[in-house]
């Protein structure tokens, strides 16, 4: 029996360069799903592109560490009203307002529906904030209330001793196709790792992009372009099929 592989491109809506990279990797490569940052500078552009490619499965990339929230979040923003990676520091200090986070999740979900004209296929998050122990239960409950699958790093959940309420997700999640050593060999190594663990469904995270002013400011910049090259390599799709995987989306779970 064929195993399900979801190659999900994160950060759709971050910028035009990111958006065009996602579309290129979907049209001419192995990307089979994406997740959108509705507070990103390229969110409107992403929505416009999605209307040209209605078959592209799009989920919600919940954001608590980038840009500005869609509503008031005094417990998380800095003096400029911006979100950032200080979320973890504030979480450790017990300074998170879960009510604010839940309300922002509702706002971003509603914004997604307004932008894309449909509900998301699933939910994940920028910088994996939904796997933070205080935040995870509310995101899981929200996804279940909406009848949506959720990205789940089961190894991380076990390490953090999260109490899972049987969320709909893949057997395995892999974030290892990332960094300065991106290659087709690395992608296939990550695939083999999941296969060895007996996963019947796997989500592989990626960030293919063309470079633009926004991407050039990112700490993770040029590897996005290398990811795009690898994900659109003519040999990769065949190699995936040879290993018994079928490309799909969270709608196939």
From Swiss-Prot:
What are the record keywords, sorted?
Answer: Carbohydrate metabolism, Chitin degradation, Cytoplasm, Hydrolase, Magnesium, Metal-binding, Polysaccharide degradation
Question: Which Gene3D superfamilies does the annotation name?
Answer: Glycoside hydrolase/deacetylase
Domain of life (superkingdom) = Bacteria
Annotated GO biological processes are: chitin catabolic process; diacetylchitobiose catabolic process; polysaccharide catabolic process
Catalyzed reactions: N,N'-diacetylchitobiose + H2O = N-acetyl-beta-D-glucosaminyl-(1->4)-D-glucosamine + acetate; diacetylchitobiose-6'-phosphate + H2O = N'-monoacetylchitobiose-6'-phosphate + acetate
Which cofactors go with this protein?
Mg(2+)
Its family?
Belongs to the YdjC deacetylase family. ChbG subfamily.
Known partners and oligomeric status = Homodimer.
Q: What is the official name of this protein in its record?
A: Chitooligosaccharide deacetylase
Gene label: chbG
